A protein has these predicted regions:
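Bacterial Sec-dependent N-terminal signal peptides
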Residues: 1-51
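Surface-exposed, short loops/turns at beta-strand junctions within beta-sandwich domains
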Residues: 476-478
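Short, conserved beta-strand segments of beta-strand-rich sandwich/propeller modules, principally
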Residues: 481-483
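C-terminal functional segments of enzyme domains
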Residues: 509
Length: 526
């Protein structure tokens, strides 16, 4: 899909056409292609062509031209609005909450599900006060227990004693979200250890499609559908071939504004469950979305996977045939487990750890998905709520107090370009934020930030990618000015905003950055 915007740029093609090693026929072909793009743009009296979500390269492009053209791949409106959320919350709640397990086997009795003081408004208000903008509810986990009274199975809240079988967790949570103006998403596990049809691919795909249809039809707007890749072959020995194309069609038809995450083609998994993004995080990547034979073949050819360190470098782009706007989501739990376990009440992540996670997710061009599991009462535990409160207060106190006078003025930067900013007099800083206008692509490959100290420029920090947002911390410093230099960029970079802040010191985190978490394979994320 081609999107026309207001700034003219045909440099990559001009360079291409002037190269001496191309045949006349190839130049004619490319000239024709570019003329076609310009005609498309002229329909709206605009001259620059961007590629929304996906670009397949013509075979005749050189490596350098591929890299330059990657700078013109942009997000869809849904992807852009999703990225702006920054903070989202996972709610793992279900039969596992009452059995003490992480993965149920589907044999659990629905009578076990009986929260004693269910309060969805408490969930949403606690998360909203901490700055979260969307929640994703586990409507069904791998055990197959459904949190809504589905027509597809009796393994649901309708068979539980909660509200005498008349309750609907999905509806209660969605209505609470609406009351608090919180966006709502669903997690629906394709792997179902209770469904009799699981392993009979056509039958189960119809079963799953019906469940998906119920959730996307009966509860109003849904903003994200989180599709897990676990399929249980190793656990149960049943081989189920999911009809992903069918599932995508249902989502796109019933909830066109929702992003499809993880096994979907709008949002990708960062590759670990530790709350740690990449130092170099490209939203433009040749990583093929989803799980299919063609996807596996191409990803293997490029030697990339969701867990790879490099998903978007020039070397990877040069080898690719198709590239995607496929941004990263960082998922991690506030506790060791994903579901509530009372023995973990004293293992809730510290404020220092939560702040680190924020800098290593939102601050590394990703969206954070922080899991906060309700307890057997049906409430967020007081320990979790207190840490959320402290986290929200800390982030607000830090980033609501801008120290730059003129950081919100957008600018365009070629490689080597700099801009200076004035710092409010007598203010100390130790944190910097940079943002690109990703509606015009992600382009910056390397930058440096300096402070004017003792009449000379001193390096404070440096980095590689920026993307939607990059946050960097450094030692406390008092400087009258800040200078940002874009050392390397794939094309003219569109710097949307630069900010400088002072973050209060926190007690050092004693555990290793990665804790005791385990990296998982991409097809067994949860």
């Amino acid at each position: 899909m081609f999107i026309e915007v207001c700034h003219t740029s045909g440099i990559w093609l001009q360079d291409y056409l002037s190269s001496s090693n191309l045949s006349l026929m190839k130049k004619i072909i490319v000239s024709g292609l570019w003329l076609f793009f310009l005609l498309l743009s002229a329909c709206n009296q605009r001259a620059n062509t961007y590629f929304e979500k996906k670009l397949t390269y013509p075979d005749i492009l050189t490596s350098d031209q591929k890299v330059k053209l990657a700078a013109y791949v942009i997000p869809t409106q849904q992807q852009y609005e999703w990225q702006q959320l920054e903070l989202t919350a996972f709610i793992h709640f279900g039969i596992n909450t009452f059995t003490g397990r992480e993965w149920g086997d589907g044999s659990e009795s629905p009578t076990l599900f009986n929260p004693t003081d269910f309060d969805a408004d408490q969930w949403i208000s606690s998360l909203q006060e901490a700055g979260f903008k969307m929640i994703i509810l586990t409507a069904k986990h791998h055990d197959g227990f459904c949190l809504w009274p589905t027509r597809t199975t009796t393994h649901s809240v309708a068979s539980s004693p909660w509200h005498n079988g008349q309750g609907d967790v999905v509806r209660a949570v969605k209505e609470a979200c609406d009351r608090h103006e919180m966006k709502f998403g669903i997690y629906l596990s394709p792997w179902d250890r209770n469904a009799e049809s699981y392993g009979d691919s056509p039958r189960y795909n119809a079963f799953f499609t019906e469940q998906l249809t119920e959730l996307l039809t009966n509860y109003g707007d849904v903003h994200e559908v989180w599709l897990d890749g676990a399929n249980g072959e190793e656990s149960d020995g049943k081989v189920q071939e999911y009809d992903w194309a069918r599932f995508y069609h249902v989502i796109d038809s019933l909830q066109p504004n929702a992003v499809k995450a993880i096994m979907g083609d709008d949002v990708r998994w960062v590759g670990n469950e530790n709350g740690v993004g990449r130092e170099t995080e490209w939203s433009v990547t040749p990583l093929q979305p989803g799980i299919s034979e063609a996807t596996a073949i191409e990803n293997k050819r490029l030697n990339i996977s969701p867990t790879a360190d490099d998903l978007g470098s020039q070397d990877i782009i040069e080898q690719s045939q198709t590239i995607y706007w496929y941004p990263s989501q960082v998922n991690v739990s506030i506790r060791p487990g994903w579901f509530y376990h009372p023995e973990e009440d004293h293992q809730v992540k510290t404020l220092a750890r939560l702040v680190d996670i924020y800098f290593q997710s939102v601050g590394m061009n990703s969206v954070l998905l922080l899991n906060v599991p309700p307890d057997t009462r049906g409430r967020l535990h007081e320990a979790d709520v207190e840490q959320l409160r402290q986290f929200g207060t800390y982030i607000g106190n830090t980033f609501d107090n801008e120290k730059l006078i003129d950081g919100d003025i957008p600018w365009k930067a070629r490689s080597g370009a700099s801009r200076e900013y004035n710092i409010i007099p007598d203010e100390s800083i130790n944190t910097v934020m940079l943002q690109e206008d990703i509606r015009k692509g992600q382009r910056v490959e390397k930058f440096i930030v300096e402070g004017f100290i003792d009449n000379k420029w001193v390096k404070l920090t440096e980095g590689t990618t920026i993307g939607y947002k990059r946050l960097l911390r450094f030692d406390n410093t008092s400087s009258s000015r800040l200078r940002v230099t874009i050392n390397e960029t794939r094309d003219i970079a569109n710097i949307h905003k630069v900010g400088a802040y002072f973050a209060s010191a926190l007690e050092a985190e004693t555990e290793d950055l990665h804790g005791n978490e385990t990296n998982l394979n991409s097809n067994q994320i949860k």
